[in-house]
């Protein structure tokens, strides 16, 4: 038996097989916890952790890849480390509840959280991240709109929603920074976007 025996058992949620392998001297490594987390096999994750299986940043990161909120919670609440990739992967895959949980429990994030959420049409993740202080500077917003969203404009209602959301927020920021109000007609904005892709 090798380390693969344990992570294959965890990957498929075979708790009794995992227990048997471990109790009979089969080695395991961080991948046992990772595969349990990404596939939502909480009992396998608990057993592995409680019996000394190592875990690390990738355990939380991989839990968010498939929206495995309970595995993410268990890992974090039991001392598993995380980093900004946890938020990035949650946003990239549209797992809003994982993104909220990570952020509200102090997980860091950066511009990639907004960029990947927008690139993949996850408007709720874009809104949540932006409205909760995720850094997304104007140059990144411009890049998102010009290089990612406008080419998708015809094919995706969500892309339109994200562009409109960014433009509304950008207008609000400009008003606050310049001390004057300037409201753009969104129909005019939509016509401009449509003319760029015709």
Features from the language model and the residues they span:
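Ankyrin repeat (ANK) tandem alpha-helical domains that serve as protein-protein interaction scaffolds
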Residues: 1-198
């Amino acid at each position: 038996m090798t380390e693969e025996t344990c992570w294959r058992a965890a990957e498929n949620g075979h708790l009794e097989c995992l227990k048997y392998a471990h109790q009979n001297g089969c080695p395991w490594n961080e991948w046992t916890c990772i595969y349990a987390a990404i596939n939502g096999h909480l009992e396998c994750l608990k057993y592995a952790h409680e019996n000394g299986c190592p875990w690390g940043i990738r355990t939380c990161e991989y839990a968010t890849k498939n929206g495995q909120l309970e595995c993410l919670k268990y890992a974090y609440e039991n001392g598993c480390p995380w980093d900004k990739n946890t938020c990035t992967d949650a946003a990239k895959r549209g797992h809003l509840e994982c993104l909220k949980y990570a952020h509200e429990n102090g997980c860091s994030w950066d511009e990639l959280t907004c960029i990947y959420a927008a690139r993949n049409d996850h408007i709720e993740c874009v809104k949540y991240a932006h409205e909760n202080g995720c850094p997304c500077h104007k140059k990144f917003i411009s890049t998102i709109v010009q290089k990612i969203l406008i080419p998708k404009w015809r094919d995706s209602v969500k892309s339109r929603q994200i562009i409109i959301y960014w433009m509304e927020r950008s207008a609000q920021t400009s008003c606050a920074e310049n001390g004057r109000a300037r409201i753009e007609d969104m129909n005019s904005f939509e016509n401009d976007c449509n003319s760029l892709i015709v």
